[in-house]
Amino acid sequence: MSFKNISKKNFGLITFIVLTIFFIGQVLIDGPVICKDTQSYIDMNFTREAGYSLILFWFRSLFEKMGLTGEAYGQPVYLLAVAIFQSIFWIIIIWKLGMYIYRFFGPLLGGLAVFFQIAVAAINRYLANRGSMYSESIMTEAFAMPLFLLLTIYLWDLFEEYRTSTLVKLFLVTVLTITIRKHMMVFLATWMGVAFVMFLFVKKYRESKRFLVSLVLGVAALICVTAIDESYNHAIRGVYASHVNGNMCAIETMLYTEVPESKELFSKYADSEEFPHLDELYAHIYDTVQEKQYAIEYYEGFTSRENLSVVNDWVTLVEHYAQVLDDIGYSIIYPSGNAYVAQYFPELDNTHAQIKEDQVEKEIFKVLLMDDLKKFFTKEGHAVRVVLFSNIIKGFVISAANTSPQILIKISGFIYILFFAIFIMCLLRGKERVARMMFIVFAGLAVNCVVTGAMIFPQPRYMCYSMGLFYLTLCCGILYR
């Protein structure tokens, strides 16, 4: 029996065995992998989303009730159970992806669907050592990666056959995924964007009511995520509040290109009661960023803001940007904000002090954002545009390959040209299903690049969600007849 003619049953069995060997094998080799941010989820830190912290809490509570409080691989044994559970979840979702592709395109492409997901996982584990992306890592990505695959399958299915049950699954899993990892708001944006294009502009699917249904569900998803987050914090901390520190990354990004004149934006806060002397806080933060050379003027090759060029500067610029961003946030903004709250609001307990510090960050974010938007298309906004477009380019590059060695940048460019050429050929040759799937995958990839590039900085752990799907749909376009 050739692989080409393999039955659905045998295909499912073989791929399930292969996936089990790979992912369970990794758990047995590594045990639970502890990363830099792991402890904050275990501690149910106020800066973290509710979903993953609750999963860890439930496992911990269950094992304590059963009297299983020993260690495995040098960590509490319940973390090994979490790692195994996560790995089984990966197995099930990737197997589901393989079976979905088998259903429409046969065993070869179904096998490639499984292969590309294993390949991405293997690259993360054995070549790139991206610890947070392993199935056995005690990190939100360990659930977000397979959930992103599952949501993509549901979005494919929504346009394969429009069903209420698919919409319900999309809604529920979207809420779950964002509750676990806020970064997955990018999928909600993808869903809304795809629905907008398909239901309003593509003749076969044109149905404005269906777009409105998706839009209502999208808004409802945001409301549910917020309600879950606030209810969780009320149960844990006694206050109805979303997790804090959500604006710091965006402030880091804006501070990287700010000029001395930005201090004047905060002069109105000199006599503010809600944010007393916020102008002094911002001036301190800005001056410290400059003093430590964490701003755009200090990347290698900088001559002047006017001479900045995306074409010539983006590689060195984004490298410097990525190196300094966390330092801007965690060594300047966050401690400065905490010191500010301690000085002007000493009566607040720890929880309310964190809420106040978050409000301070939101206020700074709002002021800087409005100013950046106002000047974005002007001469003064040139540096902002260069950083944004440079980050977006990097996002696209590392979603398909990497920036090092630099030959991979050119290779990724060729791959995108090939992808679009195949996409157009699929449209011209009536391969509608393949073209639709390629469009949805690329939409998710593009939204992730733009949002991540605008809010923080692209790095492989943020960008590889679509990688396996990107190469899968490219192969579907090339191989399917």
Language-model region placement:
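Transmembrane-helix signature of polytopic, membrane-embedded enzymes
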Residues: 95-127, 145-146, 162-169, 439-440
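Extracytoplasmic catalytic/substrate-binding loops of multi-pass membrane glycan-assembly enzymes
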Residues: 27-73, 77, 242-243, 353-358
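Juxtamembrane membrane-water interface segments immediately following transmembrane helices
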Residues: 34-36, 40-42, 218, 222-342
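Membrane-interface alpha helices of multi-pass inner-membrane proteins
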Residues: 167-181, 218-229
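Multi-pass, polyprenyl lipid-linked donor-dependent membrane glycosyltransferases
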Residues: 123-155, 177-190, 462-467
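Membrane-interface anchor segments at the N-terminal boundary of transmembrane helices
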Residues: 77-89, 346-446
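Membrane-interface transmembrane helices that cradle and orient dolichyl/undecaprenyl
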Residues: 149-166, 481
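Transmembrane-helix motifs of polytopic, lipid-linked glycan transferases
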Residues: 84-107, 150, 154, 422
